[in-house]
């Protein structure tokens, strides 16, 4: 168990170093996803199933993909960073030393029987769907309304509906008047 923890911890550190050292932002997001997946697998191997799955859903499925969409929408040309960042090395080494000293001086085993008995994802799911089922339904309705609102906000105001009353697609038809009037301009 300790060796798995060390392997995934080193994977997180290596992927995090690649995030900040890769010049291409798309590859940087890729390494960020790998760091998040390593953290999720580390949590799952420690018996914290719920936190590991939340890491995958929230961080990999939402935040990293949002970063990727923003990077692809901005479409900045590749810039080569010619600045020397070696003056940050002493600060980075001192932060690493501080974290290492805090970790080595912390108590090795911290146990809480209440937390230890509720780490199973099945217990959390059964508690959500039996005791708090009304809140789950309300949350799903709020998310549905938010999704419909996002679709309506993203729709352009002057664009026609996708289909007419006969079920034919309106986007595949061409506007003959616009084509004729463009030829004479």
UniProtKB/Swiss-Prot annotation:
Subcellular location: Mitochondrion membrane
GO CC annotation terms, alphabetical: mitochondrial membrane
GO molecular function: NADH dehydrogenase (ubiquinone) activity
Domain of life: Eukaryota
Pfam families assigned to the protein according to its UniProt record, in alphabetical order: Oxidored_q3
Family of the protein in this entry: Belongs to the complex I subunit 6 family.
InterPro entries documented for this protein: NADH_UbQ/plastoQ_OxRdtase_su6, Nuo/plastoQ_OxRdtase_6_NuoJ
TM regions (residue ranges): 3-23, 28-48, 54-74, 87-107, 134-154
Gene3D superfamilies: NADH-ubiquinone/plastoquinone oxidoreductase chain 6, subunit NuoJ (1.20.120.1200)
Lineage: Eukaryota, Metazoa, Cnidaria, Anthozoa, Octocorallia
Reaction it catalyzes: a ubiquinone + NADH + 5 H(+)(in) = a ubiquinol + NAD(+) + 4 H(+)(out)
Membrane topology: Multi-pass membrane protein
The protein's name: NADH-ubiquinone oxidoreductase chain 6
Main location: mitochondrion
Recorded coiled-coil stretches: none
Signal peptide (UniProt feature, chain positions): none
Protein function: Core subunit of the mitochondrial membrane respiratory chain NADH dehydrogenase (Complex I) that is believed to belong to the minimal assembly required for catalysis. Complex I functions in the transfer of electrons from NADH to the respiratory chain. The immediate electron acceptor for the enzyme is believed to be ubiquinone.
EC numbers on record: 7.1.1.2
Protein's UniProt keywords contain Iron: no
UniProt KW keywords: Electron transport, Membrane, Mitochondrion, NAD, Respiratory chain, Translocase, Transmembrane, Transmembrane helix, Transport, Ubiquinone
């Amino acid at each position: 168990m300790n060796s798995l923890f060390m392997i995934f911890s080193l994977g997180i550190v290596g992927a995090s170093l690649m995030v900040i050292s890769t010049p291409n932002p798309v590859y940087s997001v890729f390494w960020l996803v790998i760091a998040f997946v390593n953290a999720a697998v580390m949590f799952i191997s420690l018996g914290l199933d719920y936190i590991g799955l939340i890491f995958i859903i929230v961080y990999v499925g939402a935040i990293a993909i949002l970063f990727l969409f923003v990077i692809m929408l901005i479409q900045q040309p590749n810039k080569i960073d010619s600045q020397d960042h070696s003056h940050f090395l002493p600060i980075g080494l001192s932060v690493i030393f501080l974290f290492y000293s805090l970790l080595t001086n912390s108590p090795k085993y911290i146990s809480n029987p209440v937390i230890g008995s509720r780490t199973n994802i099945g217990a959390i799911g059964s508690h959500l769907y039996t005791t708090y089922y009304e809140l789950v339904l309300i949350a799903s309705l709020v998310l549905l309304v938010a999704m419909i609102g996002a679709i309506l906000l993203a729709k352009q105001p002057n664009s026609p509906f996708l289909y007419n009353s006969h079920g034919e697609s309106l986007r595949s038809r061409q506007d003959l008047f616009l084509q004729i009037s463009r030829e004479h301009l």
